Amino acid sequence: MAALTTNIKALFDRYNLEIPNYQRPYKWTRKNIEDLLNDIENAISDSARYKDFRYRIGAVLIHDDREHDRMNVVDGQQRIISLFLIYKHLDSQYDCYLSRHACFSNRESQGNIQDNSAFIRQWFSSRDDHERNMFISAFEKTLEVVVITVDDPAEAFQLFDSQNSRGKPLNPHDLLKAYHLREMTDDLYEMEHAVEKWE
C-alpha cells in the first residue's frame, strides 16, 4: 500500500482511473454538487489570502490493476465523478483516460450525471471568465487529494468494506454486490454478466 498527495488535475492526468462494475450507482445530488462548488469557491478565496494554501478534498482508494493497465476506484467514486463533471464543464476539450472509459449503464447514475451536469452549467452561468479560470487553476494547484494505492484486490476490497462508512452510506444490497463481485475478480465475463443481472 502506498499513499501520496496530488492535485485533482494531476489525478485525472496521471492515473488511468476506471469506475469498476462492483461500484454502486452515482448517487450525488445537486445539493452535494452545490456544497462541493461552494467549498472550492471558499478554497479559492483562502488561496488568494494565504500563500501556498492547499485544500484537501479527501482520500481516494484505488486498486492498481496492472494486468489491465488501469486504476480501479475502490473508494471516492462519488467525489471523483463530481469533480470530473465540474472540470469537464470548465474545459470541454479536456481528455483523459476517465473521460474515454467511463461507462455508466445504470439509469440512476445516468440521471444523476445529467442533473448534476445541468446544475453545474447553471451555477457557472453567473460567473465570468476570470472566476472560471480561478476554478481551473484551483484544480491544478489548490485542490488536493490523498491517493492510496493497493496492488492486491483482496486488500482493496477489505479497505472498501471498512471505508464505506464515509460519504453517502452504502445500502445493504450495494455491500452484498461488492462482496460477491470481489470473488469474481479472475473472470471478467462472469463479473460483467453478474453486474447486468444485478442492476
Label every PLM stretch briefly:
Residues M1-E199:
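Covalent nucleotidyltransferase
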